[in-house]
Structure formats: C-alpha cells, structure tokens
Swiss-Prot record:
Keywords for this protein: Cytoplasmic vesicle, Repeat
Descriptive protein name: RCC1 and BTB domain-containing protein 2
Gene3D superfamilies reported in the protein's UniProt record: 1.25.40.420, Potassium Channel Kv1.1, Chain A, Regulator of chromosome condensation 1/beta-lactamase-inhibitor protein II
SUPFAM superfamilies: POZ domain, RCC1/BLIP-II
Coiled coil: none
One GO-annotated biological process of the protein: liver development
RCC1 repeat coordinates: 64-115, 117-169, 171-222, 223-274, 276-326, 328-382
Predominant cellular place of this UniProt entry's protein: cytoplasm
Organism: Rattus norvegicus (Rat)
Domain notes: The BTB domain might play a role in targeting to acrosomal vesicles.
C-alpha cells in the first residue's frame, strides 16, 4: 500500500491543459456539479475544470471570455473575495477578458492559472506559500505573480498538494511552496515563498512539459529525457530506490527512450514515448500501473495496451486511476475504478479519457482543463460538414476507383484554387479521377468541407502527394502532423523519403531526428537497405554533422 500523508488524500494537485481536440465528445454534464447550471448556462461554456475533495468545486469560462465559479469555496479557492459557498455561478470579475492557457490546483485547494499572454495568477490555500506571493495568508482573490517571472512567458502550470511549478516559453521551470521532501528542487527542505528557478541538472536543458505528483515534480526535456525530484516513498520517481531527491535527477532507466509526455497519479507515474508506448512506475495497490499485479515498481515498467499505438495518457492526483487513448480512438482505463481494482488496461466504450474520470474516478473531477463548444445550433462549419458526400444536395460527383463521392461545385471553387479554374466553365456533373486513390481523394474533399483530415498515418502520405500536387499549403501541414503520429523504426526511412520527395521540410526534419535517435535499429531495416543513393548520401552527411557517428 502506498504511504498516505494525513490531509493529502483529498484534492491533490494536477496539471491540466486546454485542448482543442475532440470538442464534440466532451460533455460537462457527466460531472454532477454541473447539474446546478441551467441549460442556457451550459451552452455558453467554453472551458471547464472540476476539482475539490468530492468534485464539489468548478471553474469555467464562457464564449464571452468571462470566468465563473461555484462550489463550497474551501480556503477561498473560488477567488471571489470571500469563503462563502455558492450553488449559483459567480463571476470572477478580476479575470474577465483573460484567456486561460493552463490551469492546475492543489490539495487546499490552491489554484495556479496561466493566461494566453503568459501571466500567472494564484489564489486559495496558502499555508505553505504555494501561491508564490511571499506570504502564508490564504488568497481570496486572484493575485498576479511576477516575482522572478516579470520577463517570462509562462505556457504551462502544474500543482502538487502544496507546491507549484510553472514552465516558461524558453524552457525554464520555476517552483515554489511546500518543500518537505525536496519537491521544489532547491536542494533543501525549506519552504519556498516565491518563484525560484529549478536548476541543477536542468540548468542547460530545455524543458518541454511538466507534471507534479502529490509531493514530487517531473519535467520532460527536448531530448526526451525525464527529470524527477521530491518525494519517492513509493518509488514514484522511477530511480530504483525509495529515497527522496531534493534536486532534479534523470531517470536513467529510460536511457535511449524518448519521452513525449508525463502524467502523475496520486502516487504513481505514467510516461508516453515517441513510439506510442506507455511506461509506468510507483504505487500499485489498485493496479494503477497496469502491469497485471499490485506490486509497486521503482523502475519504469512497460504497459501493454493491445497492439494499439497510444497518443494520450491521463492521470489525476486525486485518484488512483489511469487512462489512455489510442491512435484508433480506443480509450482504456485501469487502476481504481469505482471501487474496483483493474490491474490491466481495460477497453471502454468512451470516446475520450475525460469520461473515464467523470464516470469511474473518485472523486469525479477533470484531469485536465476541458474545452467544449455550444451545440444549441449548427454553425456554418457544422452545416458544411453535414453536406459532404450528400447525394441529395450535391451537383457534382467524382468517380474514383468505381465509387462516387458527392460534392458541391460552389464550395469546391471557394475552397480550392485548382477547382476554381477546372470547374469554371464546366457543365459536367461527373468527373472521373484516376490520379489518386479513393481513400485519399475522399479525404481531400472532406478536408475542403471540414478543414480536418481523417486518414490513418499510413495513408496520409498519399494525401501529402495530393496536397503538393494541388499546392494546398494548410493541407500539407496537416498531413505532416498526421504522418508524424505513425512513425516507427520500420517506416522512418520511407517517411523521410516521402518528405524529401514532396518538399515537406518540417516532416523531413522530424523523420531525420527520429532516425538519428533510433539509428541502430533504423539502419538495420529493409527501408534503409533500399534507400535511394542520393538520399542515403545526404542522410549520412547530415547525420555526421550532428555527431551521430561519434564514439
């Protein structure tokens, strides 16, 4: 069983990030506290965060950039200037007009919020200086934190139980608050009343993301390494021991593995690699590591999730629950799920990881800042999306591989320069297409209606070819983003070749870096053996310049 510090179990801190993906699948109604809001109010919500020892506090923003709060207001965590509870939404006037980029909260609870302008505001519980304002007085209203941050652009925040971290745009981490286990990373165990840069092993590193456990801190740097510090009683630092770390220490067991993201549960840790693999370590009394048993692990241990590539991991400091989403859209959960111990990843019927925490975590809270959109009416974009491939309203159909795709001439001419000229004087209502496959051309037309692409990474190369052929710059960028999600050692050279062929410079650099980071395996693949001579020559030359062949 993991060690629990009295008073720490309740609302432990967790990092929450705004997300623009899967907006239609998010439903704030799954959190009971939103039953206090009217339907009209729910339709205006743009972002939402549910927290508190019983999921009894909420902060949300509206389409008008107003911030509202409701709940028990423990320690003044609603920021409205008093400690009165409220079952009706109250507007947080001091932050009206501010757009939230990142938000996190702690056990008191205390709130740390970063705006899209890079400013930091804090309020709520402050017995351990976790607000960073130099005092230990609770903050009843949002306070702008500028000490040592005045010239910094903060892009991400994270809270432990009673300590806080922020990440700046230049890759620096600042920390403050409770430090009994070294979680502030200052090298001592004295509390830190104001923001202090975390240095040591991070001094010359560029940090890409941060996370906090109950009393520990973590950072992922641009090289894919993970640095950890603070409390380690359950092995949650992944160092093979249970001793606390007062300064950042690299997780050596992940040598050669590039981590993209880290997430912290109550006393366990998850990381996601660039190949879509999950590793877990720390407390495991509820099966939250997903290893098939309940034994704690002090070293990173692989989590097997079918044969699906994972693109998202989720954990929440107030629960012993873990979740993940695959490239194919499957959502898995494990750990403590409504009182049951699920010791292996379990495939759910959910569309997003947020639903796992709404329906199975205790308490029912959000693990990140949700983004939602009103659905009281169809927007222009939604209306256009509905009309794609609709034979009832179309005035044009494409014949591709023996199958029809229905479209509308006026929209195609508005959205695509190629169609603007090719359809200008055409009276044909059927166009045969042989240059591209049915899935690729259908995905292209769907993109013109929705501004999104829905192709798996392995087929997106064909769409990249089309985007290059039609000079569709934005589509080309989206294709590159999709292709990146499917890279592995076996196809890295093929994707690099495609990137060079279609002058996709961002993808080319990404594939090259991936090949360098996995050089030993990549050079043994059939793709490398069959590599074009000129491409091979350029690859070796460039690899040499970045020191890939140094002893």
């Amino acid at each position: 069983m993991e060690e629990e510090v009295p008073g720490f179990y309740g609302e432990s801190g967790k990092s929450v990030q705004a997300t623009l993906s899967s907006l239609k699948m998010l439903d704030v109604g799954k959190w009971p506290i939103f039953s206090l809001c009217s339907e009209e109010e729910l339709q205006l919500i743009r972002q939402a965060c549910v927290f508190g020892t019983a999921g009894n506090e909420v902060l949300y923003t509206t389409v008008n950039d107003e911030i509202f709060v409701l709940g028990t207001n423990c320690s003044g965590c609603l920021g409205v200037g008093d400690i009165q509870s409220t079952i009706e939404p109250r507007r947080l006037d001091s932050l009206t007009g501010k757009k939230i980029a990142s938000l996190s909260y702690g056990s008191g609870p205390h709130i740390v919020l970063a705006t899209t302008d890079g400013e930091v505001f804090t309020w709520g519980h402050n017995a351990y200086s976790q607000l960073g304002n130099g005092t230990t007085n609770h903050g009843l209203v949002p306070c702008h934190i500028s000490t040592n941050l005045s010239n910094k652009q903060v892009i991400e925040v994270a809270c432990g139980s009673y300590h806080s971290l922020v990440l700046t745009s230049d890759g620096e981490v600042f920390a403050w608050g409770y430090n009994n286990s070294g979680q502030v990373g200052s090298g001592s165990t004295a509390n830190q009343p104001i923001p202090r840069r975390v240095t040591g092993c991070l001094q010359n590193k560029v940090v890409m993301s941060i996370a906090c456990g109950q009393m520990c801190s973590m950072a992922v740097v641009d090289t894919g390494e993970v640095y950890v510090w603070g409390y380690n009683g359950n092995g949650q630092l992944g160092l093979g021991s249970s001793g606390n770390q007062p300064t950042p220490c690299r997780v050596a067991a992940l040598q050669g593995i590039r981590v993209q993201r880290v997430a912290c549960g109550y006393a366990h840790t998850l990381v996601l690699t660039d190949e879509g693999q999950i590793y877990a370590w720390g407390a495991n009394s509820y099966g939250q590591l997903g290893t098939g048993n309940k034994s704690n692990q002090s070293y990173p241990t692989p989590v097997v999730v079918e044969k699906d590539r994972i693109i998202e991991i989720a954990a929440c400091h107030s629960a012993h629950t873990s979740a993940a989403k695959s490239q194919g859209g499957h959502v898995y959960m494990w750990g403590q799920c409504r009182g049951q111990s699920v010791i292996l990843p379990h495939l759910t019927h959910f569309c997003c990881t947020d639903d796992v925490f709404a329906c199975f975590a205790t308490p029912a809270v959000t693990w990140r800042l949700l983004s939602v959109e009103p659905d009281d009416h169809l927007t222009v974009a939604e209306s256009l999306k509905r009309e794609f491939d609709n034979p009832d309203t179309a005035d044009l159909k494409f014949l591709v591989d023996g199958k029809y795709i229905y479209a509308h001439k006026v929209l195609l001419k508005i959205r695509c320069e190629h169609f603007r000229s090719s359809l200008e004087d055409s009276e044909d209502d059927i166009v045969e297409m042989s240059e591209f496959s049915y899935p690729v051309f259908r995905a292209f037309l769907e993109y013109l209606y929705t501004d999104n692409i829905s192709l798996p990474p392995e087929e997106a190369v064909g769409l990249l070819d089309l985007a290059t052929f039609y000079s569709e710059t934005r589509l080309k960028k989206l294709c590159q983003q999709t292709i990146k999600q499917g890279i592995c050692e076996e196809n890295a050279i093929a994707l690099l070749s495609a990137a060079v062929k279609y002058d996709a410079q961002d993808l080319e650099e990404f594939c090259f870096r991936f090949c360098i980071n996995h050089l030993t395996v990549v050079t043994q693949t059939s793709g490398f053996a069959e590599m074009d001579h000129d491409l091979l020559k350029n690859f070796i030359s460039k690899a040499s310049r970045v020191g890939a062949f140094k002893n």
